[in-house]
Amino acid sequence: MLLEKLNSATSKIKLIEEKLQDINLIKDQKKYSKIIKEYTYLEKINTKKIEYEKILSQINDTKTILEKEDQQEMKELIKQELIDLDKKKEDLEHQIKILLLPQDENDSKNIIIEIRAGTGGEEAALFANNLYSMYIKYSEKKKWKTEIINFNETELGGFKEIIFEIKGKDVFKKLKYESGVHRVQRIPITESNGRLQTSAATVAVLPNIEETEIDINEKDLRIDVYRSSGAGGQHVNTTDSAVRITHLPTGIVVQCQNERSQHKNKDQAMKILRARLYEFEDSKKQEQRSSNRKQQVGSGDRSERIRTYNFPQNRITDHRANITLYKLEEFMQGELDPLLDPLMIALQEQELKSNSI
């Protein structure tokens, strides 16, 4: 069964190789990049297929040798070799099944992250700032580039909302599971009685969508301009540079005032709008998928509580995979991989069960 799936996938390699011979293909960089990506993926599958066929052959050969062997001592050695080969086969099958999971076409895309303060007032806004700082530090470790698109700052330096872009290799693949409600438990600096408080911030991770990837009719947009305002300070000016765009069919509203010019703010607002419209359409598709899968795999829904940050205990718990680490301080400094790596594996395991590969 698994070998059939491998053969089916790798049968496309020759066809893609023929396409890559077409000199006109390079003129269309977008199409060329897409085909190269598919070719690279299929080559990975082909490598695993060769490994798998080799180990199946080794198992068969070893079984044949065992049947012909008369000496008991040699039989025991051969049996142990079979046990080792079966273990290798099992591990390889697991790797192959994960490789054969449906590929997310957005994995290689840059992202837009929106962080909003939730319940908890000023403390929630300060936590939103902490999360922003955490993702920036993680991006620096990964050599990714970041840029603020828009923010709404509080008097104490928290964020009611901050929207920023991260550019780099496999950014969406690495951070797509961050969407959801992040809950914090700590004693706020605003709390004079020293009582533990629970607050929350919402994170949305959206793939950065190019203009050519989504059609937006200008007639469906209402564009308003107004004067920048807020506690943000340095970029706020007295001209009508801030832009608010309303997508009339969906009611989605985006605004941007971070840039000095109206033109740049409009470009940034359109970038956010494309991402949100894509998410809107994608969420409709998700609703059509089986309820079984939605129960087992983190849906990426921004209303789903995904993680708790407990500062007194130096504890971070991801509720989707029941992963707990007592390294919260390091985590907030951008050391995310000790949690993100096992989380991705756990969610892939859940997806394997729901896909029955």
From Swiss-Prot:
Q: For the modification N5-methylglutamine, which residues carry it? A: 234
Write out the PTM section of this UniProt entry.
Answer: Methylated by PrmC. Methylation increases the termination efficiency of RF1.
Task: State the residue spans of region: Disordered.
Answer: 283-313
One Gene Ontology cellular component term attached to this UniProt record is: cytosol
- Answer yes or no on keyword Protein biosynthesis: yes
Under the heading SUPFAM superfamilies, the entry gives: Release factor
Matching entries from NCBIfam families are given as: prfA, PRK00591.1
Protein family (similarity comment): Belongs to the prokaryotic/mitochondrial release factor family.
Record-given protein name: Peptide chain release factor 1
Source species = Borreliella burgdorferi (strain ATCC 35210 / DSM 4680 / CIP 102532 / B31)
What gene is it encoded by? prfA
